[in-house]
Amino acid sequence: DEVFPDEDDFGNIFYRQANMSAKGIPQIAVVLGLCTAGGAYVPAMADESIMVRDHSTIFLAGPPLVKAATGEEVSAEALGGADIHCKISGVADHYADDEPHAIKIARECIANINWIKPEQITRKPIKPPKYDSSELGGVVPSDLKTPYDVREVIARIVDNSDFAEFKQYFGETLVCGFAHIFGYPVGIIANNGIFFSESAQKGAHFISLC
């Protein structure tokens, strides 16, 4: 309270967000428009954030301020749109095509929250993968130096081939996400190429959620 003394402004919001995070209270942000200045910190501090293509933006200063400060003209989308934050900066975790898709992703995030105690895990009805596991020999090349998409492996292992991927477009050489195997909820981390710093950042974030 001494650090953030205001009662109604952003200092108080940041204080509460930080405290909720420390207490393990999940925070999911759905950005459906502009998040500017202090508002830009809210989705960045959330556990998971969702942005909508060509509709959501996150930045501390908008295009007019950028032009005033640097003389550079830049669009809001190029400055802080979904493509920037889902694919390059990693600030956002999920890329939605439209608002209904963003809400659908948010529901999936809530469904995957790790709040249930281990002894209370709910087992879902077992559904076989949509793709035959016998095809794995054709998916994974005999030469391990030959690249392949590990998602094709996951699709042949998890129930109903349903995989809720996390940060799909960021750190793409590491694939992370939630699924079910034999009805049990699982978190999956799979190598998908050369490991880069973005991949490590993504993996650490996912482990904290899982």
Predicted feature residues:
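Conserved catalytic cores of soluble enzyme domains
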Residues: 1-118
